[in-house]
Amino acid sequence: MLSITARNLASALRSSLVGTSSRVAAVRCLHGTEESAEEFDKRYEKYFSREGIDGWEIRKGMNDLLGMDLVPSPKIIEAGLRASRRVNDIALAIRWLEGCKDKCGDQKATLYPYLLEKITPTLQELGIPTIEELGYDKPELALKSVYDA
């Protein structure tokens, strides 16, 4: 009991004798200039169009894009589709489409048809089916709701 009291007293004395340092607010410093939308699109198009890009790097680029607070432009989506086709990974291409569809959020009814309209020639050229063509846009084994009857 005495040792606990002594420790608490020592701690209180130490904090009162030692001056508290002034706290400086952290400042976030951004390096370089702000990137425009066109430069951003070109950077990712160039990333996906690199020679010798492998599946892991493609997945990393797609994951980075889908983690950002934006819907990728049709040019970037096409570049990602071509890259996944170059490494012969059609499943990756379909997942990329599904991720882009999911990024449309509550604007899915307007944005996703626009994206599909823009990338349909590329999809046909590469032979990549959409999620709707595969029938994976709705759950396969889902039961009808009792409230819909």
From Swiss-Prot:
What's the protein's topology in the membrane?
A: Peripheral membrane protein
Q: In which pathway does it act?
A: Energy metabolism; oxidative phosphorylation
Predominant cellular place of this UniProt entry's protein? mitochondrion
Q: Which Pfam families match?
A: COX5A (PF02284)
Recorded GO CC terms: mitochondrial inner membrane; mitochondrion; respiratory chain complex IV
Lineage top rank: taxon: Eukaryota
Q: Which GO terms describe its molecular function?
A: metal ion binding
The UniProt keywords, alphabetically, are: Heme, Iron, Membrane, Metal-binding, Mitochondrion, Mitochondrion inner membrane, Transit peptide
Compartment annotation: Mitochondrion inner membrane
Q: Does the keyword Membrane apply?
A: yes
Which GO biological process entries does UniProt record here?
Answer: mitochondrial electron transport, cytochrome c to oxygen; positive regulation of cell cycle
Q: Subunit structure, briefly?
A: Component of the cytochrome c oxidase (complex IV, CIV), a multisubunit enzyme composed of a catalytic core of 3 subunits and several supernumerary subunits. The complex exists as a monomer or a dimer and forms supercomplexes (SCs) in the inner mitochondrial membrane with ubiquinol-cytochrome c oxidoreductase (cytochrome b-c1 complex, complex III, CIII).
The family assignment reads: Belongs to the cytochrome c oxidase subunit 5A family.
Protein function: Component of the cytochrome c oxidase, the last enzyme in the mitochondrial electron transport chain which drives oxidative phosphorylation. The respiratory chain contains 3 multisubunit complexes succinate dehydrogenase (complex II, CII), ubiquinol-cytochrome c oxidoreductase (cytochrome b-c1 complex, complex III, CIII) and cytochrome c oxidase (complex IV, CIV), that cooperate to transfer electrons derived from NADH and succinate to molecular oxygen, creating an electrochemical gradient over the inner membrane that drives transmembrane transport and the ATP synthase.
Instruction: Tell me what this protein is called.
Output: Cytochrome c oxidase subunit 5A, mitochondrial
| Lineage of producing organism | Eukaryota, Metazoa, Ecdysozoa, Arthropoda, Hexapoda
